[in-house]
Amino acid sequence: MYFKKKYIGLIDKNCEKKILDDSSTIKICYILIGILIGTNMITLIYNFIFWDNYIKCYRNNDKMFYCPNDWVGYNNICYYFSNGSFSKNYTAASNFCRQLNGTLANNDTNLLNLTKIYNNQSMYWVNNTVILRGDNKYSQKVNYTDLLFICGK
């Protein structure tokens, strides 16, 4: 039957063909599978032991951080930009940011650069001041003006 089959394979030193039966073929398959599993296990163990070498941010020793959905990560801070139809006055914007466990973003150079990258077509509330359209400037505004806003955390 099936186990009685013989296969021609491997050549001996005298260049004569050897005949392999099913059991020797299966043994060779088991050996190859064992070698593959063994090398995978060694690789996994090595990676587990030396994992710290793989997770590094080399620029300024930054640490990895994650932001919630709809937030933008920049310089280890998460920012929420309100969209075009979602403008509020200063007090309402500040309260909304608190509901998101954040505050109105502080006005600094990093945020100014981010607004130029992210969206330079609007004015945003940030910490009781406003980032002007497309300019590298801040301007004081009255608190009741409805504008877009940026939360940070």
Curated annotation (Swiss-Prot):
Keyword match Glycoprotein: yes
Annotated TM spans: 31-51
Domain of life the protein comes from: Viruses
Transmembrane among keywords: yes
Assigned keywords, A-Z: Disulfide bond, Early protein, Glycoprotein, Host endoplasmic reticulum, Host membrane, Host-virus interaction, Lectin, Membrane, Modulation of host cell apoptosis by virus, Signal-anchor, Transmembrane, Transmembrane helix
GO cellular component: host cell endoplasmic reticulum membrane; membrane
InterPro entries: C-type_lectin-like/link_sf (IPR016186), CTDL_fold (IPR016187)
Disulphide bonds in the chain: C67-C78, C97-C151
Coiled coil: none
Expression induction: Expressed in the early phase of the viral replicative cycle. Expressed in the late phase of the viral replicative cycle.
Residues exposed to the Cytoplasmic side: 1-30
Gene Ontology BP term (one): symbiont-mediated perturbation of host apoptosis
Record-linked Pfam families: UL45 (PF05473)
Glycosylation sites per record: N83, N89, N101, N107, N113, N120, N127, N143
A GO MF term: carbohydrate binding
Subcellular location, principal: host cell
Topology within the bilayer: Single-pass type II membrane protein
Segments on the Extracellular side according to the record's topology features: 52-153
Cellular localisation: Host endoplasmic reticulum membrane
Family: Belongs to the asfivirus lectin-like protein family.
Assembly: Homodimer.
Function: Down-regulates MHC-I expression by impairing the appropriate configuration or presentation into the plasma membrane of the latter. Participates in viral hemadsorption, which may help viral spread. Reduces the transactivating activity of host TP53, thus inhibiting apoptosis. Non-essential for virus growth in swine macrophage cell cultures.
Name listed for the protein in its UniProt record: Lectin-like protein EP153R
Biological source species: African swine fever virus (strain Badajoz 1971 Vero-adapted)
